[in-house]
């Protein structure tokens, strides 16, 4: 059976950093909480004047191509997956961001479309592309996101009142671009082993991005206390248990080396590790994180983690990695993959 693999990965991380101390010092209402202690985020990556969704996606895509055997002209498809779609000061929905990227990169034969699924956007794009490769519809493709999302943090600085404010979670975000090229796996050392997503729309109203209720700014309103209950967090391990059981497998037998959770904050990751340990009755793999430096970069967060660890040569050979999305919607699931030759130059 045909399987897909991560052929290459790339990223663009702005050089600018905004510290948690700096961010909260600018709040209209002096905070009665220690955001850094709550989230574990010391700084977050922040767009520079030259950056927008488009430029960050282009830079991430070029980074990915530099690490790839493919050139842009070889790409069969481009899927753009960002939440924000800024080109300059304008937010574009038509024409799609993927068309801008196709022309700029020179991917002249590539079909193209956009997918938006909150912080699970890149997972959704990869899920579609993996299915297309397995079905023989395309041979390869680029999934990319330029996530300029700090606009909601700027709104929260002006409007959030306390830890219970629905805009509180917006204070964790940072900006970054990420890109992945998938193609057909040639062996079991580099392969997507198992990939499934689940959406639970009954919880879709717990996090909504929209214009602010109090200004003309972009904002996100999230009920974190309801989103992060144990009942919600257990959706992931229970789903993975069911999917693995259908293949006659369990978590222990998968022998994961590393796990990457959504970079919302350190306490959130710790809770998911605890829930996973209890649900699977198994110790959790080593947890990879870069949230202390970059914050929650939304749809790019898992892939920024993977990119940074590859760049620093911190992963052992023939690693097996589990990625667990967590997004508004409520979307979760798991991507299990083996990597050996995936590298960042």
Regions found by a protein language model. Give the residues of each.
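Active-site-adjacent elements of ketosynthase-type condensing enzymes
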Residues: 88-98, 146-163, 197-213, 266-273, ...
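Phosphate/pyrophosphate-binding loops at sites that engage ATP/ADP/AMP, CoA/4′-phosphopantetheine
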Residues: 60-76, 238-257, 309, 314
């Amino acid at each position: 059976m045909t399987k897909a693999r991560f052929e290459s990965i790339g990223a663009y991380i702005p050089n600018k950093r905004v510290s948690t101390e700096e961010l909260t010092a600018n709040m209209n209402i002096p905070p009665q909480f220690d955001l850094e202690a709550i989230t574990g985020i010391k700084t977050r990556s922040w767009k520079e004047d030259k950056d927008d969704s488009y430029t960050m996606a282009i830079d991430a895509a070029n980074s990915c191509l530099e690490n790839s055997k493919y050139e842009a002209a070889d790409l069969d498809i481009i899927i753009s997956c960002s939440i924000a779609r800024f080109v300059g000061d304008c937010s574009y929905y038509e024409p799609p961001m993927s068309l801008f990227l196709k022309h700029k990169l020179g991917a002249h034969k590539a079909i193209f479309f956009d997918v938006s699924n909150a912080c699970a956007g890149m997972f959704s794009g990869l899920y579609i592309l993996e299915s297309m490769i397995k079905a023989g519809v395309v041979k390869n493709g680029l999934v990319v996101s330029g996530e300029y999302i700090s606009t909601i943090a700027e709104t929260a600085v002006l409007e959030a009142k306390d830890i219970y404010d629905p805009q509180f979670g917006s204070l964790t975000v940072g900006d970054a671009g990420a890109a992945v090229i998938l193609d057909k796996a040639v062996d079991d050392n580099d392969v997507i082993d198992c990939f499934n997503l689940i959406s639970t729309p009954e919880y879709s109203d717990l996090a909504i991005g929209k214009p602010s209720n109090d200004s003309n700014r972009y904002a996100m309103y999230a009920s974190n206390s309801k989103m992060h209950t144990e009942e919600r967090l257990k959706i992931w391990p229970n789903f993975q248990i069911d999917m693995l059981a259908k293949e006659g497998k369990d978590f222990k037998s998968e022998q994961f080396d590393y796990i990457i959770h959504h970079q919302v904050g350190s306490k959130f990751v710790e809770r998911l590790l605890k829930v996973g340990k209890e649900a699977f009755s198994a110790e959790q793999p080593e947890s990879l994180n870069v949230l202390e430096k970059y914050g929650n970069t939304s749809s790019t967060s898992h892939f920024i983690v993977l990119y940074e660890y590859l760049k620093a040569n911190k992963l052992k050979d023939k690693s097996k990695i589990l990625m667990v999305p967590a997004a508004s919607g409520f979307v979760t699931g798991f991507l299990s993959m083996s990597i050996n030759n995936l590298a960042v130059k």
